[in-house]
């Protein structure tokens, strides 16, 4: 890095003489997809810096509509106009109301109370329902909901809703399908999003979303509450595992890939979304993922520049780039303003800058929470008014009729005009039209799609995703893969070594995760997977003991048993981490690993036997660095899902070559919290992460050579330095070679470093990634094209800004310099 910078400094005078500046002119810049946009160059008072400003409408220009789009929109608008002209105030408010399924079921049952449902349908015309009857726990002795029960339930609700509606308006049902259709029995469960991100392979995000949509739509539910697009920079936060990690670019690319997978590459604004696709929900818009306290739904203090630099891009890519049909609003507050009351962000930014045309739904009880939780409203009426003024469309009430009753009174009193209802109702009806609910509201229990739930090829896709996610962080003396010629006895221990429940984490069968492994009809634990692929014979013997159970007092007897078995083992594999959790119940006060798990690990390391540490965890729990470095190997498994056990076993035995990379910074101490890899230059050396973002080893070695810019102008006499014109796209190529003896996949990461800017730049930012699969001694040239937006930052005026200057492009150990004028 220092060499490149020095060459830049030496060549600046020559470059400035060679390249002229223009001021106040209109120029064209390269943007997403190779398109161009016209921007106005802002003059500078002095010096030779050039500065350009971009808007999201230029970065993501609206697509050209074809005749099919035009016909669809015309037919939809005519239909919705006619329907709305016949709707009463009560019907319109009903469309804006969403209730939980448990408002329709009796305690400890999943049976729909049809009398209650008919009352809601005929009196309040409720337009949406959500959730699983067993989300919060067992309903009597019922653990899960299978496809036939779901289909019967949805058909019952839909039939009674349509019968009760004067205009035969169908309801829309939504479900948290977070890592697969996790509330549908037998559905395939994938790694949670941090694991997906660790693959650095957008194909896995697309495939996971496609299968999730298919399995959700198969039971009659066309609305999926996913993906989470928050940036995972607060490791204390209970929902960090639902994010795609700490990097805005990874979250943007993986999130957009998921949106396209969920919706079949379509959006609901200019065309239909047909089965097996569902409409998805970009959530939680936005700033939710970095609560200052680390506790769920608590206050976030994020300056406007940081919001726009790090937290908004993933939503822009998903909404404006990929066409997400709905958004769910951040339950918390940002800079003292609950997002549900923010006209700036829900209307000016979301509807204005991001051009969002879809439905904005609240999260759980969030309008009511403006009164008793946020204290911005002194009454339910004031809370509803604040939320409507801000721009919500649908209220996830979800447990009573307060919203429709009070809103009807407010409209009757003239406090809320009917025209405000019409804005939201039109969006909701447009969505229902796009999903085909008016023409085909009832799911078919005999449809072929129902039989595909949990099919073998889906579970194989989940296993393949887990294989590419698992990240080898440490491998002393190449202890992995385990050599069966020299290793005959293995001890497998730890609380997550034989637990499918722990592999899945939260949002699995129930909101807080499964109670027991028997709730999963498919899947393998690590122990089962290891025994299956090794046959567990006398030639390779696997011993198992739990060692310790998470959440119970220290049981030295269990630890002693593990230590005793370790004495007769050649290698010890210990699997530690966390129990399933989600949202507020998952709040913690200390990021440190459970001390009893640390004690188990310490005593196993003290035996002197090689210890392979496997981490199965929702958050990067802090471990004593010296203890971790004493382990022979470290594998990060994240929450790999039901199918995760066998991929982990295959990596241990060398049947699969690990290729995951960390999508977040793994802290070594509490002082590392809140400092991501893209920190400022002034923060260099202030943290000591246990492992860095992008870390990940392989059983082979990859070499990078010949990094070059194919359409830049080389600087004469300055090898590796180039010049270019601000606002253009540039293509960089690098050759990747497998120098080892085994086939392997490699995630090739391209970073951009802005050396000087009007706003202090980050040391580096990821601007491209690709996955390659190479046989030994084979090479492949990788190409990355960076458009103008990817050289931008958020300027002193909080606008997207391009500025002439010096940049470093980095891929592995390769670097080049680029001066843009």
UniProtKB/Swiss-Prot annotation:
Residues 25-69 form a propeptide. Its EC number is 3.2.1.21. The keyword Glycoprotein applies. The keyword rRNA-binding does not apply. Glycosylated. The polyoligosaccharides are of the high-mannose type and are highly substituted with both phosphate and sulfate moieties. GO terms for molecular function: beta-glucosidase activity. Residues 1-24 form the signal peptide. It catalyses: Hydrolysis of terminal, non-reducing beta-D-glucosyl residues with release of beta-D-glucose. It is an enzyme of class 3 (hydrolase). PANTHER family: LYSOSOMAL BETA GLUCOSIDASE, PERIPLASMIC BETA-GLUCOSIDASE-RELATED. This is Lysosomal beta glucosidase.
């Amino acid at each position: 890095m220092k060499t490149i910078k020095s060459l830049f400094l030496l060549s600046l005078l020559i470059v400035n003489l060679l390249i002229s500046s223009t001021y106040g002119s209109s120029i064209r810049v390269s943007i997403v997809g190779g398109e161009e946009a016209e921007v106005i160059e802002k003059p500078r008072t002095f010096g030779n810096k050039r500065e350009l400003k971009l808007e999201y409408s230029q970065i993501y220009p609206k697509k050209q509509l074809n005749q099919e789009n035009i016909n669809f929109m015309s037919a939809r608008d005519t239909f919705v106009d006619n329907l709305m002209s016949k709707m009463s105030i009560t019907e319109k408010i009903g469309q804006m109301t969403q209730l939980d399924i448990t408002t329709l079921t009796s305690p400890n049952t999943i049976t729909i109370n049809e009398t209650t449902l008919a009352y809601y349908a005929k009196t309040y015309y409720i337009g949406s329902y959500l959730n699983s009857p067993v989300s919060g726990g067992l309903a009597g002795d019922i653990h899960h909901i299978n496809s036939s029960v779901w289909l019967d339930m949805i058909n019952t609700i839909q039939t009674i809703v349509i019968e009760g509606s004067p205009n035969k308006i169908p309801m829309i049902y939504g479900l948290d399908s977070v890592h697969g259709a996790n509330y549908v029995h037998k559905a395939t469960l994938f790694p949670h999003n941090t694991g997906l991100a660790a693959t650095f392979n957008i194909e896995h995000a697309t495939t996971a979303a496609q299968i999730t949509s298919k399995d959700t739509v198969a039971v009659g539910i066309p609305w999926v509450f996913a993906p989470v697009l928050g940036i995972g920079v607060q490791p204390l936060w209970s929902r960090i595992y639902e994010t795609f990690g700490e990097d805005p670019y990874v979250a943007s690319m993986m999130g957009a890939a998921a949106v396209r997978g969920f919706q079949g590459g379509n959006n609901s604004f200019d065309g239909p979304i047909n089965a097996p696709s569902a409409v998805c929900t970009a959530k939680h818009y936005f700033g939710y993922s970095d609560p200052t306290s680390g506790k769920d739904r608590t206050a976030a203090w994020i300056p406007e520049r940081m919001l726009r630099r790090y937290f908004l891009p993933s939503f822009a890519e998903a909404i404006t780039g990929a066409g997400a049909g709905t958004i769910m609003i951040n339950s918390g507050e940002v800079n003292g303003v609950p997002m549900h009351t923010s006209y700036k962000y829900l209307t000016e930014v979301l509807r204005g800058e991001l051009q969002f045309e879809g439905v904005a739904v609240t999260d759980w009880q969030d309008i009511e929470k403006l009164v008793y939780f946020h204290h911005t409203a002194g009454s339910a009426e004031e809370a509803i008014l604040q939320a409507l003024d801000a721009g919500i469309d649908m209220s996830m009430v979800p447990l009573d009729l307060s919203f429709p009753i009070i809103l009807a009174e407010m409209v009757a009193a003239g406090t809320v005009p009917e025209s405000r209802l019409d804005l939201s109702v039109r969006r909701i009806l447009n969505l229902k039209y796009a999903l085909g609910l008016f023409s085909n509201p009832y799911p078919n229990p005999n449809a072929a799609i129902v039989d595909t739930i949990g099919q073998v090829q889906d579970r194989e896709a989940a296993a393949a995703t887990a294989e590419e996610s698992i990240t080898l962080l440490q491998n002393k003396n190449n202890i992995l893969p385990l050599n069966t010629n020299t290793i005959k006895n293995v001890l497998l221990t730890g609380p997550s070594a034989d637990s499918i429940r722990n592999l899945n984490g939260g949002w699995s069968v129930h909101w807080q995760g499964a109670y027991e492994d028997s709730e999963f009809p498919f899947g393998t634990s690590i122990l089962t997977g290891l025994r299956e692929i090794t046959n567990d014979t006398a030639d390779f013997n696997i011993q198992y003991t739990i060692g310790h159970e998470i959440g119970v007092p220290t049981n030295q007897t269990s630890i002693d048993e593990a230590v005793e078995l370790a004495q007769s083992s050649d290698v010890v594999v210990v699997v530690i981490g966390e129990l399933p959790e989600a949202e507020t119940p998952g709040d913690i006060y200390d990021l440190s690993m459970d001390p009893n798990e640390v004690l188990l690990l310490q005593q196993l390391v003290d035996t002197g036997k090689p210890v392979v540490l496997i981490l199965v965890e929702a958050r990067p729990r802090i471990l004593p660095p010296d203890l971790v470095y004493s382990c022979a190997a470290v594998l990060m498994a994240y929450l790999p899902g039901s199918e995760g056990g066998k991929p982990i076993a295959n990596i241990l035995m060398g049947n699969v070559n690990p290729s995951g990379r960390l999508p977040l910074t793994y802290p070594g101490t509490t002082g590392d919290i809140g400092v991501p890899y893209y920190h400022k230059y002034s923060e260099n050396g202030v943290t000591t992460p246990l492992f860095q973002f992008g870390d990940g080893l392989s059983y082979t070695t990859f070499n990078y050579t010949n990094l070059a810019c194919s359409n830049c102008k080389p600087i004469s006499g300055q090898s590796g330095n180039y010049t270019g014109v601000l606002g253009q796209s540039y293509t960089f190529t690098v050759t990747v070679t497998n120098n080892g003896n085994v086939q392997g996949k490699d995630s090739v990461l391209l970073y951009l470093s802005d050396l000087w800017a009007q706003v202090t730049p980050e040391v580096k930012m990821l601007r491209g990634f690709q996955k390659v699969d190479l046989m030994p001694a084979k090479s492949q040239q990788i190409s990355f094209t960076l458009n103008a937006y990817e050289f931008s930052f958020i300027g002193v005026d909080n606008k997207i800004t391009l500025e002439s200057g010096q940049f470093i492009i980095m891929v592995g150990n390769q670097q080049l310099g680029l001066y843009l004028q």
